[in-house]
Amino acid sequence: MNGDLRENCRLLDEKLHRAVNPDMHVRFFRTFLRDAAVYYVDGLISTDFMQHYLLFPLQNAAETASSGEIAGCIRQRVALCEVEAFFDVREIVAQLVSGHAVVLADGMDGALSFDVRGAVRRGISPPLTESVVRGPHQGFNESIRDSITLLRRILPTPELIGEMRQIGDAIPVSLCVMYLQNAVDESSLSRLKARLEKVPSGGT
């Protein structure tokens, strides 16, 4: 990761599969008179904590900082978050999928990772209605967003893709097709998507 913010963002977008993963977010802002960006995974972080203790002090930093000073200035400005510097894109991605927010700034080599974790805390418990079924039992009863978060806690990898879709006409139903990019059988995935497209209105 070099000091080119646009190139670093392009690289992270690619590694996170942001084109299809709906919970991989980036927000652009200015700090120390420089363009900057913060990446995070929705559901794995506390957005209130990030806004108040990370973004607010950085967005209000109106001083100038050179390329060599910007990382140190950001560290000093954000006092209430654990922070660590990373320079390898794989390490940066690992920080993101573990619930950290990652800040990049134009002219700054690498990225700064801030611990702003705050996710759905319960484990995936066995569904009571399936107590006699053999095999692993894992039940989901939350919103789609929370269910995606629970899965990301189990499989902390950007290769876990979540494609949001809407099926049905009269009563549209939102759903998320989740799969491991590096393990899925593409033909089976295509057949699944085709069958979902054919679900009739009211048949969900």
Residue ranges and their predicted role:
Residues 1-204:
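Membrane-embedded alpha-helical signal segments
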